[in-house]
Amino acid sequence: MKVRASVKKICDKCKVIKRKGTVRIICPANPRHKQRQG
């Protein structure tokens, strides 16, 4: 999980999700693409 100030989709499979006020990116294809804003 990468924690970044600005999260962007890395590939086409990445999805932007908002959980408890934080923006997250999850990727079923490549788990390395997981990100969280913070």
UniProtKB/Swiss-Prot annotation:
A Gene Ontology cellular-component term: ribosome
GO annotation, biological process: translation
InterPro entries per the UniProt record, alphabetical: Ribosomal_bL36, Ribosomal_bL36_sp
Protein keywords: Ribonucleoprotein, Ribosomal protein
Membrane-traversing stretches: none
One GO molecular-function entry: structural constituent of ribosome
Keyword Zinc included in the entry's annotation: no
Pfam families: Ribosomal_L36
This protein's record includes keyword Ribonucleoprotein: yes
Family annotation (PROSITE patterns): RIBOSOMAL_L36 (PS00828)
HAMAP family, per the entry: Ribosomal_bL36
Family: Belongs to the bacterial ribosomal protein bL36 family.
PANTHER family: 50S RIBOSOMAL PROTEIN L36, CHLOROPLASTIC, LARGE RIBOSOMAL SUBUNIT PROTEIN BL36C
NCBIfam families, alphabetized: rpmJ_bact
Protein name according to UniProt: Large ribosomal subunit protein bL36
The species this protein was found in: Anaeromyxobacter sp. (strain Fw109-5)
